[in-house]
C-alpha cells in the first residue's frame, strides 16, 4: 500500500462531519453505535471496517443455460467515498451451476474464521504513512444484498406471509383474490409518526381505512440472539433445503442460523444487513414514471 493510500485509511475518523448530513457510513447511527460499544477497536483509527456484498448471477448472460455463481466481495469503508470502488476485493467465488442455498455457509466458513482472527488478535502490519508497525484489527460492519439474497444469507425466508423479517408475525399480509399465492403487505403506514396525515387517509390507500397501529417492537441484541440460537442445528449437504423447523411459515420463517452470528461482535451490530438500492431505486423510478405517463399496464393505479 502506498503512503498516500495508507494516510487515507484514517479518513473515516478525521473527515469533517456536518450535522444531519451523511456523506459516509461513519456519519450514521450504526457506525457510531459500534464505536461506542467497542471503544478499544475504534480508538485505533487504522483498524479496518469492512462491508460484504454477495449475489448470484449467470456469467454466460443467457437464460437458455441456467447457471448461478456467487461472488463474495469485501469493501473497505475507511477510505473516502471516491476511493472505495478501487479497493473492492473479490474474496471468493461460490461456483454453480445452481445456487448454493443454505450450503452457502459452508463456503463462507473460512472467511468467517479469518474475520474472527482479525478481530480477536489482529495482524502485525506496517504503516507506510507513519513508518511504523502496529497491530491491525478488522470488523465486518454489515452485509449488502438484494432482498432474495438477503433471505439466503440471513437465514430468514423472504417468501410467504411472513416474508418481512422486521414485522415477523406482527404483519398484516393477506392474499389478493385474483393473484394466486402472492401475498400483499399493507403495514407501511404504521411506521409513520402518530399524527401523520397519511394515517387518516382512507381515499388514497388500497385498504381504505385509518391506520391506528404502531410499528412492531424491535428485538434487542440478546433477544434476537436467543431466537436464532434455536435454529442452528441443520445438516448441510444435498438435503439441507428440505429441512424445516417446527412452526415454519406459521410463527416464523427461519431456515437456518446464519454463520455471521459466529462473529464475536455480530450481536452488537445495530445494522447487520443492508438492502441493495439498485433494484429499489430502479423499481421506484419505473413505477412513478409509468404512472405519470399513464402507461396502462405498468401504472401504479389499479384499473378494474
Regions found by a protein language model. Give the residues of each.
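Domain-level cores of phosphate- or acyl-group-handling catalytic modules
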Residues: 1-304
